[in-house]
Structure formats: structure tokens, C-alpha cells
């Protein structure tokens, strides 16, 4: 059970969905800059699993993963979403003993999740889109050390900034594509011998350009 009120959670979910749409990152291929962060997180915290988790409306999708062989799971099974809109580090030292997670299939099933810590991914807009988390297959009664917590939070900030920079780069690429399309349309208009040729040429350019948004 999540601790936020339904209304607050709804607002956070709407803000998150909007931010993820703007990031244009869901279902994209692996990227070394993100893969490196989960590798370092796992090694720094001494755990077998680390993930950069983005919380979509009906699933949690992993932009980067270390030690896990799936790309996403149902949002209902997400530990990362617990108290997500508080924007704080979440740590559960024994997932089998916590009422919020003890019946989670990722805990009771073959994945055998036992301990969890996740730092929020907070964008410049304030939207919290997910967590950088580390997971152990054995309980950790003492939890993370102060240094490990600080490292996890620092890596989460780097992941958040990486998401922002990726968005800016993609927006710049898109602007270049649109500018190129306008130049091509101008050339078609100048070189066309008639309306039919002009319409056909410009339609092809517009169709190709819009297709990249899908």
C-alpha cells in the first residue's frame, strides 16, 4: 500500500507521464552512459542487481540493468513506486518482512529480491520519473552504509542529468530534421513544373518527417 493520498499520487503520475513523454526515452536501446551507472552502483553497494527504473503508467521499464534479464515488469509489482513522489531515498532492508512488499511476486518468486534501496530520479522540472535502485538477494539488516547511500544518491543525480542531456540532444536532432525538411520543401517548390508534382514532392517530405515522431 502506498502512503501518499490517492489525489497526490494521481498528480504525481500525471506529471511523471508528461515528463517521460518529453524525455522520449521509453523503449529505447541500451546506452553505455546509463549502463555504466548501474554497474558502478552495483559494485559500490556490493549487490548483484542495479537498475535505472522509469515508472510508466502501467509498467516499470528499465533504461539500464545490471544482474537482471528482463526489461520491464508490471507497475503493480514495482518497489520503486513506493513513496515515489516524496523524492527521498527508499530503503527496505528485508522485503519479506515489510507489509508493502512481502507478497510482491518479485520477492516471493524466482527473482528472490530480499533487500532494496532506491534513490529518486528528479528532473529539473521537479518531476520524479523513477529511481536508480540496488537490490540484494539476501536481507541486509544493517542497510546501506552512509557512504553507500551517498554514492547511490550521487549516481541517481548523474542519471537524472543524463536523461535531461539526452532529451536536449534529441530535441536538437529533431530541430535539425525539421529545418532540413523546410529546405527540401523549398527546393521542391522552386523546381516543380506543376501543382501535382509540387504536392506529391512536399507530401513525401512531410510524411517522412512526421514518421520520425511515431
Q: What spans do the regions from the language model cover?
A:
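Glycine-rich acetyl-CoA-binding "A-motif" of GNAT/NAT acetyltransferases
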Residues: 128
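Helix-loop-beta substructure at the N-terminus of cytosolic sensory domains
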Residues: 27-60, 76, 183, 188-214
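Short hydrophobic/aromatic beta-strand element in the GNAT-like acyltransferase core
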Residues: 49, 118, 131
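A short, aliphatic-rich beta-strand micro-motif
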Residues: 114-125
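Regulatory sensory and allosteric helical modules in signal-transduction proteins
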Residues: 18-19, 49-50, 55, 59-65, ...
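Signal-transmission linkers at sensory-effector interfaces
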Residues: 1-32, 158, 162-191, 195-197
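Amphipathic alpha-helical "output/dimerization" segments
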Residues: 143-164
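Short beta-strand-to-loop transition segments that serve as allosteric relay/switch motifs
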Residues: 131-142
